[in-house]
Amino acid sequence: MDLLFAHGDDGSPILDHAPDPGTAAAQASPVPRQPQEGFLADITAEASNLARQRWAVVTPAGAEGARLEALIQPLVRARAEDQQADVLSIRVPPGMDAAAATAWKKDVFPALYGEQEAERPRYLLILGDLDQVSLDTQQVLAQDGFPGRLAFATDDGYGAYADKVLAWQREPARQDRARALFYTVHDGTRATTAGHARLIQPCHALCARTTRDKAREFPASAVEVHGRPTPDPDELLALAAARHPSVLLSMSHGLGPPRRRPWSPAEAREHQGAMSFGVEGALAAKDVGSVPFLPGGLWIYFACFGAGTPRTSAYKHWLDMLALHGMADLGPASATLRGLDQGGGFVSGLAKAALANPNGPLAVLGHIDLAWSYSYEELRVGNARGLTGSNRSRNFYNLITKLVAGERAGAALLALRLVLGDVSAELNDHYDRYKRGGTVEGATPADALALGNLWMLHQDLRGYALLGDPAVRLPLASPAPARSAPADSSGERGQVTLCGGDHPADRDAGALDRLEQAALAIAGGESPGVIAQKLGVPRSEVAEAAKIYRDAGRAALSALLGRGAQEKGRAP
C-alpha cells in the first residue's frame, strides 16, 4: 500500500516504505464498529441522456445559495434547454454529516422532485465549498446520482467557468477523436514508482492495445505516456497546452505542509494538494490559472488532497487500527490527519485555478483526502497473514474509455461507483458473517487486518470527487458513419430535390452525414438539445435539419405511393 503525499518544503514523501503486515500484533483487540447503511441505485436509462436523467443545482440554504446560483445563470438556462425542462434548485442545510445528509435525502429530497422517479435529477451541480455544502452531502448524493462541485476563491470564477463550458458546447467541434494522455512524476519515491508500474503502464498498454485492435471500443487519436526521468513541470505544461480534447491521468504526490511547521489556513487553501515534482518544486494554482492547460479536457489527478481537504479524514481511525495490529509504519500518515481543517474543509487551490481558467479543463477528478494505491492495487490478507495484491488498473481503463468515447463526466464515474458498490456489499457480508460467530470485526488479528484493508479500499474509492459540471463531456464531433454503395443504382428509384442552395455535392460530406444522423436520432425520440450539444451546434440548427429531413422523406414516400398507385392502375 502506497501513499501519494509529500512535504511542502523539500518534496520528500511522508510515507516512502510499505508497511509490513507480517508483524501484526497477536494480542491486539479489535474495536467494534457499526456497518454503514447502503443504497441501491436504479440505473434504467442511458446514463448520458440529460433529458431522461435530468440536471439540477444544489446550493446552501438561504440567500447565499440563491446568490451562487445567479452567478451561473447562463449555464442553468442552457441545461434547461438541453433537458427540455426547468432546472430544479435544491437548497440543503450547510454542515450536514453523513447521518443528517442520509436523513435529508430520504425525508426531504423526494418532495422536491414530486416523488416521481422519472423527475428525479441525477446530474447534480453543487455550488460552494465544503463548509457550505458538506463533503458528506456530496457523497450521499453520489450513492445514486452524479454530483459535481464548483467552488472558487472569487465570484468571477463561477462566471468564467460557466462561460467556458458554454463556449466549448457551442463551438463547432474540430476533432472527432480525443487524446488519452498518461503522465508520471518520476521523483524516485516508492509510491510514484509503484504507481507508474501498477497503474500508469498497465492502463496505457491496455488503452493502446484496444485502440490498435478495436478502435471502435477506444476511439482515441493518440494514446501517449509521458514523464521525464528528471521531473520537470514545464514538460507537463507543454503537453497540456494543446487545444485538442484530451483525457489526462497523472500520477504524483500531492503537496503537504513543510516538515518544520504547519501551514496557515490561507497557505493550506492555496497549496495543499498541489502537484509535487519533488526537488523541482510543484505545479501550483498560479501555474495553471492563466496559461492553456488541458483546454476543453478532463483531468484525472491522482495525488493526495488533489481535489480538496476534508474537515476530518475518512482514513484516520482505520490507519490507527491497522497500526495497532502491527502495521506501525502507518503512524506518520495518521499523524498528518489530526484536525485537517476545522473550518469544514476546502476544495484545492490547484483545482479551483484550473477550472476557473478559460483555457483550462472542463472537469477535474481527484481525491478529497489521502490518495492511496488501493483503488488500483487491492490488498488482501493471505493464508500466511501476508498481504497479497491484485491489479485493478482496469477500473481506470473503464473510466477513461467512457470519457474518450464522449460520455458525460458524471456518467463515466459509474465505472468507479460500481466497484465501490461491490466493496460495500463485501463489507456487509463481513459484518454479517462475523456477527453470527459472536464478534463484529473478527476473532483474530488477521480478521482485523482484513477488515481494515477492506475499509481502506472502500474509503479510497469513496474519496474520489468530481469538480466541475457533471454533465460536461469532451467536445468531440460525431464521426461520420461508414456509407455503403446503394443496392440499386438503376435510376428507377424516386428522386427528391431540395430547393435553395447549391448542389449537394458541393457540401461537406462529413457535415451532411452528421446532420443526417442527428435528424434520424431526433426522429427516434432523442432530445434535439442533447443532439445539438453532442454535435456542438445550436439546437435550432438540428431542429431545422430534422424538419427538413422529415418533410423531404415524406415527400419521397408520397411520390413512391403515387407511383405505386399509377402502376397498379396500369396493371392488366
What are the residue ranges of the model-derived segments?
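Catalytic-core segments of thiol-dependent peptidases
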Residues: 79-80, 110-132, 207-348, 359, ...
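Short alpha-helical "recognition helix" segments of helix-turn-helix
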Residues: 531-533
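Major-groove recognition helix of helix-turn-helix-like DNA-binding domains
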Residues: 538-552
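Short Lys/Arg-enriched helix C-cap and helix-to-coil transition segments
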Residues: 550-570
